[in-house]
Swiss-Prot record:
The keyword Cell division does not apply. Homodimer. This is 8-amino-7-oxononanoate synthase. Catalyzes the decarboxylative condensation of pimeloyl-[acyl-carrier protein] and L-alanine to produce 8-amino-7-oxononanoate (AON), [acyl-carrier protein], and carbon dioxide. PANTHER family: CLASS II AMINOTRANSFERASE/8-AMINO-7-OXONONANOATE SYNTHASE, LD36009P. One of its GO terms (biological process) is biotin biosynthetic process. Keywords: Acyltransferase, Biotin biosynthesis, Pyridoxal phosphate, Transferase. CDD domains: KBL_like. NCBIfam families: bioF, gly_Cac_T_rel, PRK06939.1. The modification N6-(pyridoxal phosphate)lysine is found at K239.
Amino acid sequence: MPVEEFERELNERREQGLYVTIRKIGSPQGAWIIVDGKKVLNLSSNNYLGFANHPRLKEAAKKGIDDYGAGPAAVRTIAGDQLPQEKLEEMLAEFKGAEAAVLYQSGFCANLGTIPALVGEGDAIFSDELNHASIIDGCRLSRAKIIRYPHLNVQTLEELLKQERQNYKKAMIITDGVFSMDGDIAPMDKLADLADKYQCILYVDDAHGEGVLGDSGRGIVDYFGLQGRVDVEIGTLSKAFGVVGGFAAGSKLLAELLKQKARPLLFSSAPTAADVYASMEAVRILQESDELVKKLWENANYFKEHMRKAGFDLGNSQTPITPVMIGDEITTQEFSKKLFERNVFAQAISYPTVPKGKARMRVMISATHSRDDLDFAVEQFTAVGKELGVIQS
C-alpha cells in the first residue's frame, strides 16, 4: 500500500473525529498525574484500587528483580518455570476459587491463547455482540463458527442454541463479565443455566470484575456464587491488580491442556519476576482486607449520583466504569479537550471501540480519589456539558 494511502486514511479519521492522540504521562499512576507536562485529575486509568503505585507492590517488584533478574529470557516450556510463576498461579487459583490457573503475558494474550485451545473448526462459539476485542480476535483465530447474540439477551441466546447447538461437536458461550465500555454486568447465573442445559463450555472474561466485584474483589464468579459452574475465567493483572499480565483459571485439566496448546504461552517469553512478585503482593493485600474495594464503590456511587443530578446520561452502568453518553464523535473529542484545559484527564471513546453514534466519555473511578477530587470532576463536567449543549444550562 503506498504511503499516500496511509495519509488518506489518517486524514479521514481526523475529519470523522476518530483520530486517537496518545498523551505523554510523566508520573506514576494516581488520582492526580502529570500529562503532557500538566498536573491533571486522572479519570482515565484502570487503576481501580491504587495498586499501580502502591508502596508494597513497588517493594515486591524490586525484590523480584533482586531474586530473579530483569526477565526470564525464554519461553516457559523451553527454559522452565521460575518458581514465583508457579506460586502466583497457585495464589490466583485460590483467590478465584478454582483448581488451577495458567499465567499469560497479558489479558489480551490470555484470550488469544485460551479460546483457540478449546474450540476449532466444526465447533461453535455463542458470543455477546459487545465482547472485548481480545475475545473477538481469539474467536476468529479459533476458526470455530461465531454466532453472535444481542447484548445481554439471554432469551435470544437460548433461541440460537435451540437452532444451532446440535449442528456442532463442541460449543462455547463466551462473554465479558463486566463490559468495559458500558459498565454493565453479564447475567452469569442465567448463562450458567444455559451452558448446563445445552452442554456448552462457559467462558467469562473477568478483566473488570477482579478487585471490584465479589468478596474482597474475587470477581464475577464469586459475585454470582458460581464456583465450579464456570469452565474458564479469564483474568488480567493490569487493571485492579495494577501490574501487567493475564491468566486463565479453571480446572486442573484445563490448565494442563493450555500448557500444551496455548500459543502465547508456547511461543512467547513468560512474565517478568518483577510483575509476578508485584501481582502476588496485590493478591495478599486483597486477601487481608476489603477496605479498598469498599472505598472504590463509595467513590463510584457518589460520583454517579452527582453526575445524574447534573443531567448526564450514564447509560446502564452497574460498576465503577461510568460512561458519560454524548453520541456525536466530534463533540465527544471536543468535550475531552475542554476537560483537559480544565485540568481533568478523561478520554473520549468513539468508533471503532464503540459503535458509530455511541461516542462517550468513559470515566474510571478509583479508590484513590478523594471526595474533593470527585466534586471537582463533577463541577468541570457540568461546566463543559453546558458549554457544548450536552446538558441544559
